[in-house]
Amino acid sequence: VPAAAPPADPAALTERLKAQAYGVGFDLAGVAALGVPDSVGHFDAWLAAGHHGSMGYLDGAGAELRRDSRRPHPGATHALVVALDYGGREPAGPVARYARGDDYHEVLRDKLRTLHAWFEAQVGAPVDGRPYVDSGPLLERDLARRAGLGWFGKNTMLINPGRGSFFFLGALVLAWPLVPDAPFEADRCGRCTRCLDACPTQAF
């Protein structure tokens, strides 16, 4: 079935999509255009230094896919990028906070599939797309920064001004024109080194 023509006001559709993302339970939502990641140079340097170790899937063909977010799903042009808080302010314990609930891959993927179905209903036609939740060749933190969700902290995590970094990231890539959000350009860390100083293994 051929896809319907894009709506006259893609900005309004984009805003409705983000509002629906909040409606299904996500804590942050933004839109980014797919393309060459801003951090691709850091990624290549990381590979060249051998930091991927035995994770061979990150090199070769896997690296080529990650060097341009349009490659994993040809035809897709934009991504809805979302974040879901996992309760990182709960008391510490023997199990990492992010692992205490249901499998986050399934939780986020189900919500993204719900959004995909909602989007198709809004435009009245099938829309090619796919959800990604830490399970495909996308540099999700880079996409999230480009979608305005936060900045890269000195702890290498994406930090949001209102929510910190205790959240999962996911993306719904769509072959449909949307209006991207402004990327998060500021570096709010400044001279702060609290995360570096607190790390017990000096891993950073």
Q: Model regions: which residues?
A:
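Residues immediately within or flanking Cys/His clusters that coordinate Zn2+
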Residues: 186-192, 196
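Auxiliary alpha/beta "docking" domains used to position bulky ligands
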Residues: 1-188
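Iron-sulfur cluster-binding cysteine motifs and their immediate structural context
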Residues: 23-26, 194-204
